[in-house]
Amino acid sequence: MIENENTWANAIQTNSQDQFHKKFDSALESLKNEFGKQYPLIIGGKEIFAEKTFDVRSPSDTRIILAKFPLATKEQTYLAINSAKQSFAKWSTTSYQSRAKTFREVADQFSEEKFTLAAIVSLENGKNRLEAMGELDETIDFLRFYADQLESHKGFVNVTKNANPNEK
């Protein structure tokens, strides 16, 4: 059984709402240094900077350019699709134990960085801080829940008898 994050509810229960708001405000402030940064495409683990970019603006204040992202060419798009297919094939052969471990590691990392990630969600989607934190808490909870589900159901792989002995 997972223990839900419930960041805001915990802040209320421990009378630490001010600390919650200070952490969120601090995360917002630290992100301002990243505004307008140009990000690369990442295809097959390699960073590729494109000639053309587009701006991502905050919906709550469209004057703020949060980031610049590359416009992929047709060739880069095909490279990305092929890379994703290869990654899917690799992930498909990954044991359920390794998948569950990965889910938990991501959940732990998200939990450690929750105020920064929630601030990003708020800026990028225009959500208020409580909605953004709730979304992040839910993501962390789902990652942990599905890790538990994978393990309790042994990866959802059930070997059954075949009707025909030659059937695989």
Regions found by a protein language model. Give the residues of each.
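Hydrophobic face of amphipathic alpha-helices that form TPR/SEL1-like repeat modules
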Residues: 1-61, 65-66
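Short, electropositive, low-hydrophobicity segments enriched in small/polar residues
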Residues: 49, 130, 159
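Glycine-rich loop-to-alpha-helix module at the N-terminal edge of alpha/beta enzyme cores
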Residues: 57, 61-154
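Residues in flexible loops and secondary-structure boundaries
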Residues: 49-51, 64, 74-77, 165-167
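Conserved small-residue-rich beta-alpha loop and adjacent elements
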Residues: 156-168
